[in-house]
Each structure stands twice: as C-alpha cells, then as structure tokens.
UniProtKB/Swiss-Prot annotation:
Subunit and interaction comment: Homodimer. Interacts with FtsZ.
Stated role: Cell division protein that is part of the divisome complex and is recruited early to the Z-ring. Probably stimulates Z-ring formation, perhaps through the cross-linking of FtsZ protofilaments. Its function overlaps with FtsA.
Entry-linked InterPro entries: Cell_div_SepF, Cell_div_SepF/SepF-rel, SepF-like_sf
Protein's recorded name: Cell division protein SepF
Record keyword Cytoplasm present: yes
Compartments where located: Cytoplasm
Annotated region (Disordered), positions in chain: 38-72, 164-197
One Pfam entry name: SepF
Entry GO terms, CC: cytoplasm
Coiled coil location: none
Family as reported in the entry's similarity comment: Belongs to the SepF family.
C-alpha cells in the first residue's frame, strides 16, 4: 500500500544512470576531452572619458556647478508616497457598506480617517468596521475607537497617542447612586458559642 502511494507520487521512480566505462584514463585523453582555456588578456586601463553636461536646462539644474570641481549630479531621490504636504484627515459618515472601498483607498493614500458609523444599521456598521480594520491591518496602520460608533484609522506613518493622563481627564458625570448593600445577617463579633469551641 505504502509503495503504491510512493509510486503514484513519483518517489519510487526507477533511477536511470548513464552508462560509463571503467578504465584508466591517461592524461592525454583528459586534455583531449577538456582543452585548457587560454586566459584572456585584461584590457589596458584608459583614462575615463570626461563627463558631458546635459543640454536640457531642467536636467542641467540637477547638476552642481562649481568652478573648482568637475560637475557632479545630485543623486537625491524622494521616497514614493511621502510628500512634504501637510497630513490630511478625512471625516467620513457612510450610509452603506458600499462606501468602504473608498475609505480603504484613502488609507492607502496615507490619509487618516475618522469614521462615524452612527448613520448605519448596527450589523452593517460592524461589518464596515471589520472591513476597514482589516485594510488598516494590511497596511500596518493603527485604529482607535474615539467615541460611540466613531473610529479613527490611520496609516503607518501616523502615530496615535492619548496625551491625557488619568489626572487630567475631565470629570465624567457621576453614575447614578447605587442602593446601599443591606447589613449582613451576622455580626463581625464572634458569638459566645463560637468562642466556647
């Protein structure tokens, strides 16, 4: 049984060997079969050709001009997806799940999203949060719940911190007073009967 599975998977393929002749090979035969390669001479070093400045004025501006040195090219290249423009926060209040792909695209464009789901059905809102959270996870972004059905989703270039400490947090309305617990049916003092034992 095991062999039939191995045969089916191709592990018991009959090995085919090339036929070879045993015998002494003298050195003349070896050199006849494998002639020695002649080493190729190295090209003689020549002086490098002088650099020529481009004739396009916009490209020429990328070259540094200095009277004491030869022209050199400015090799600084900007990172794709990173710009010097200010960060953008998009506030979205979707009415249906069909609007979620646009929110994911905004995250991919490195924009932060404040997602207010108060206008959606609760089941559809949960599905929307799960979808956007998955997209945020896929781009190594961050998510934070900032209110009732309000979420913040940011790309990985934005760090979200809560700068308020517990002492600085504004006082929230006090919870309704709970009724006092009834007095226990037994007292904390030991009864004379318990002391006798």
């Amino acid at each position: 049984m095991f062999n039939s599975i191995r045969n089916f998977l191709g592990f018991n393929e009959p090995e085919e060997y090339e036929e070879y002749y045993e015998g002494e090979i003298d050195n003349n035969d070896y050199h006849a079969l494998y002639p020695a390669e002649m080493p190729t001479p190295l090209p003689e070093e020549s002086a490098p050709a002088p650099r020529r400045l481009p004739e396009n004025p916009t490209v020429a501006s990328n070259f540094a001009m200095n009277s004491n040195t030869t022209p050199t090219r400015n090799n600084v290249i900007g990172l794709p997806g990173v710009s010097n423009s200010p960060a953008e926060v998009v506030v979205c209040e979707p009415h249906s799940f069909e609007e979620m792909p646009q929110i994911i695209q905004a995250l991919r464009d490195r924009r932060s999203i404040v997602l207010n789901l108060n206008m959606m059905d609760p089941d559809e809102a949960q599905r929307a949060v799960d979808f956007v959270a998955g997209g945020t996870f896929a781009i190594d972004g961050h998510q934070e719940r900032i209110g009732d059905s309000i979420f913040l989703f940011t790309p990985n270039c934005v760090q979200v911190t809560n700068s308020l400490s517990r002492e600085e947090t504004p006082a929230t309305p006090a919870a309704p007073a709970r009724p006092a617990a009834p007095a226990p049916a037994w007292s904390d003092e030991m009864t004379p009967m318990a002391q006798a034992q």
